[in-house]
């Protein structure tokens, strides 16, 4: 893999990882995965000086790229192992899926915007990520053709977890998703599907774009 990083850029990335540790990220695997993925590749060229800042950044189609500490916290909450299959709903820039690809056996990511999917897939190819595939589709329906999944990550908010996602989750599996109204502060939850029922743990307050049904007619 060649990302064309200078020594200064490599040093910036090391400082970025140190910053994540200082913000409470402890999972060594998550930190290593985020070290391996060059975040500037996923950021608009005009904003690349902010690529390693802990802020959310705008991307195309009116979407956003979550701040790195939130990406790390959500990834930690998934409790991934190397044999897991993961569904991500909301590809966006592809950054989070790229991070997940270093922690799981297989990553399937779906977004309603064709242009975002095409750009993300191109970035995966640049990085040589062969275990992650992006699809255009309705994220509320999951990806039944590739189910079941050990873990599901949703990067857009809804009042509740779509039934299709619960249905495509293996028993013992985990969903991490923001719940709440799009115009309000939401709650990031960790849902565990069990034979005897389910458990749902509130993790933190967050703010995400809404989860919109259907694939976009344009863009």
UniProtKB/Swiss-Prot annotation:
Its EC number is 2.1.1.77. One of its GO terms (cellular component) is cytoplasm. Signal peptide: none annotated. The active site is at 66. The keyword Protein transport does not apply. The keyword Isomerase does not apply. Transmembrane segments: none annotated. It is found in: Cytoplasm. It is an enzyme of class 2 (transferase). GO terms for molecular function: protein-L-isoaspartate (D-aspartate) O-methyltransferase activity. Gene3D superfamilies: Vaccinia Virus protein VP39. It catalyses: [protein]-L-isoaspartate + S-adenosyl-L-methionine = [protein]-L-isoaspartate alpha-methyl ester + S-adenosyl-L-homocysteine. It holds the Pfam family PCMT. Coiled coil: none annotated. Catalyzes the methyl esterification of L-isoaspartyl residues in peptides and proteins that result from spontaneous decomposition of normal L-aspartyl and L-asparaginyl residues. It plays a role in the repair and/or degradation of damaged proteins. This is Protein-L-isoaspartate O-methyltransferase. The gene is pcm.
